[in-house]
Amino acid sequence: MASAQSFYNQSSVLKINVMVVDDDHVFLDIMSRMLQHSKYRVIAVDDPKKALSTLKIQRDNIDLIITDYYMPGMNGLQLKKQITQEFGNLPVLVMSSDTNKEEESLSCGAMGFIPKPIHPTDLTKIYQFALSNKRNGKSTLSTEQNHKDADVSVPQQITLVPEQADVLKTKRKNCSFKSDSRTVNSTNGSCVSTDGSRKNRKRKPNGGPSDDGESMSQPAKKKKIQWTDSLHDLFLQAIRHIGLDKAVPKKILAFMSVPYLTRENVASHLQKYRIFLRRVAEQGLYSMLSDRGIDSMFRQTHIKEPYFNYYTPSTSWYDTRLNNRSFYSKPVHGFGQSKLLSTTREPVCFNQMPYNYMNRSSTYEPHRIGSGSNLTLPIQSNLSFPNQPSQNEERRSFFEPPVMANKIAQTSQVLGFGQLGPSAISGHNFNNNMTSRYGSLIPSQPGPSHFSYGMQSFLNNENVTYNPQPPANATTQPNLDELPQLENLNLYNDFGNTSELPYNISNFQFDDNKHQQGEADPTKFELPAAKFSTELNHEDDGDWTFVNINQGQSNGETSNTIASPETNTPILNINHNQNQGQDVPEFNDWSFLDPQELVDDDFMNSLFNNDMN
């Protein structure tokens, strides 16, 4: 029996057109009434061949086909295959009281399986299959006017009846879906999907039907930004320009001006950079980043002011014989050095570094001699000799730089000891331009300039001659009153027996206005107790006056020549060959004098004043 049933509700509400095919007339009538009660439009057919004929006529008015599995002449699966060949992919549901046919039905392309008897809850499953087919554009809306059918195109917005609004939405099941993913509820006969059915759902490609019937186009995946070294350097420049505390992705992006960068890229990189800095701070590696660093692309991104070590000595500027000289010393006059070394040709560049960076040692204790003296007396604690280890890690200068107003000193690197004029050294030109810049000494001429070498030259009694070129009518009187008495100076034991002198030379005075026309009477005396001899020689050479004082020990002789030049620009000559061409004056023997008389100040003053005049 084939008859067209009218709608239960005659209003023009969206209807689902369902064709029911079953050879059992009783079940076909019950099924049709249930669907009509749920606002379906039902076409009931009792033969598979009639169903094919009806489809040829009302193909566009049928949204879903429900067929029984067991039918004479053609079973439900054969009907499904024939419909697919002739009319395309129409949704077909298979009904059967034999639940073993579920797997076979699904594997052959059926959209679903409904076990008999039908339960009202199964009607919702029927609706979801039909609605999915309608949204694919294959269904029509039928409105009954005067009991006649009219085809109307389905609008995009579908209005659902209240009974169909709460229907769940599922996908089309694959043909290879297994029966163990579904269980049959024996109480109500309904087929309930397990958790595995939802997990096995696959997302359909773009443009195809989805869960809610709408094509869901996935957004294109953003291209990953590769932070190269140049791009990272630009990022660091932006950080330095803006400041780490005020750096935000918007400002950094504006500073970098890279077209393909986004705020998300910069924000992600900035977050990684701050995490890197936090990790560095926790490990306490800020001081080691310049050498070792952390294995990261942020290895050069710790932001701080550049550190300049102005105080690291560079031994490449010096000869190896200068190892014991302080690199932080200032240019100073030697101990006992007179003002005869003053010149106006080249200035003394004192150390321009602040004292708070110099790491001055507590053992550096200068002792001033006199109120107007430019000399500084060293103490034993801050004298460094080869055989005596220094108390400090860094060797310091022996003397504090003299405070001189408009005075210019040109001295050698040797800090002389017990000098009244130039330092007594050998093999080194005294006109050695020496300046101190930024805490280090830069000699312009190589040579032995060690303090110990100067003292060794003093003890070895090497002959040195001082030959200036003074202009006429010039007088220079060294301030000898400010010289300390050497008997109070106790040096290290390596100096030998030179810590005490048998006479006081503080009253030496030179009068250069009086020139001697002939050779002065030479005087010679010898002190056996002190094991040294002193030779005084007054020598006339034009407008020059020389005083030779020779002090000797058993191991050698040392000659200090003191002159009173009449010029402001003295020239120091330490050429031994020059002394050979000069006449050697004769000396008188002073050995008959009493050593106690030599110690007497009045006797020595009268003796030297008479010789000078």
UniProtKB/Swiss-Prot annotation:
Residues 178-223 are annotated as: Disordered. It comes from Arabidopsis thaliana. Keywords: Activator, Cytokinin signaling pathway, DNA-binding, Nucleus, Phosphoprotein, Transcription, Transcription regulation, Two-component regulatory system. A motif (Nuclear localization signal) lies at residues 221-224. It holds the Pfam family Response_reg. Disruption phenotype: No visible phenotype. One of its GO terms (biological process) is phosphorelay signal transduction system. The keyword Membrane does not apply. Residues 17-131 form the Response regulatory domain. Residues 178-195 have a biased composition (Polar residues). The keyword Transmembrane does not apply. Mainly expressed in siliques. Also found in germinating seedlings, stems, flowers and roots, but not in rosette leaves. PROSITE patterns: RESPONSE_REGULATORY. This is Putative two-component response regulator ARR21. One of its GO terms (cellular component) is nucleus. The gene is ARR21. Belongs to the ARR family. Type-B subfamily.
